[in-house]
Amino acid sequence: MPIRAVLWDIDDTLFDYTGADAAGLARHLRDEGLGERYGTAAEALALWRKATELHWARFAAGEVTFLGQRQERVREFLEEPALTADEADAWFERYLGHYQAAWALFPDVLPALDALAGSYRHGVLSNSSEANQDHKLRHLGLRERFEVLVCAAELGVSKPDTAAFLAACDALGLPPAEVAYVGDQPEIDARGARDAGLTAFWLDRDGGRGPGPGGVHRIEGLEQLPGLLAGDTRFGARSGIR
């Protein structure tokens, strides 16, 4: 069956989340008068990301709400477990202002989307919330390029669960065999998509993250994607997919 649609991850696939997070946190800590509290900017960022990974995993497992994981990240990072929800929300909103000011697409995103626009339908599957990612896509000028936006917070299940990928395919009205998925995480994105029956592309921008899961297609930039999809033997051409 030919591939008719491409589903996309957003953070660190289309949008440079890592860069925006680092820049936003540094500016936020400076404005909050916390610049010296954590030693270097790198040390502060490491603590922030440790808290983010811990509580995002809890959200993905259904242990806390989307807003709850934000509040817990703030409490852990500040080492203030008694911080109220309103206080944690306010701190996080101030951080968001700096983080959003640093939002940017990777330079290969628009050329790839333009090259694929006439041949494939497009959608998004994200482990975030619809409100968060809709706002992000609109800010970045991408929202109208995607027919569907499916997010874990509303869906009640997150990647790499097969059900998340199947729900996104259902939203497109296509079977998994006719859908490709592109994401930067080898397990959450690529393995999850593969296990759900989609054609999985792991976007390894650094090119040095070690071997990926079997049965997925590893690319180091989105400029590779149009040629690889067009070269799939299911279209009767020599396969360019490895």
Go through each PLM region and give its residues.
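Asp-based, Mg2+/Mn2+-dependent phosphohydrolase catalytic module
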Residues: 1-6, 19, 110, 114, ...
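N-terminal helical cap/lid subdomain that shapes the substrate entry/recognition surface
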Residues: 2-107
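A short, structure-level motif marking secondary-structure boundaries and short turns
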Residues: 10, 58-60, 97-98, 118, ...
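N-terminal targeting/docking segments
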Residues: 34, 39, 116, 236-238
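Residue-level marker of alpha-helix boundaries and capping positions
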Residues: 65, 103, 124, 180-181
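Glycine-centered short loops/turns at secondary-structure junctions
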Residues: 119-120, 197
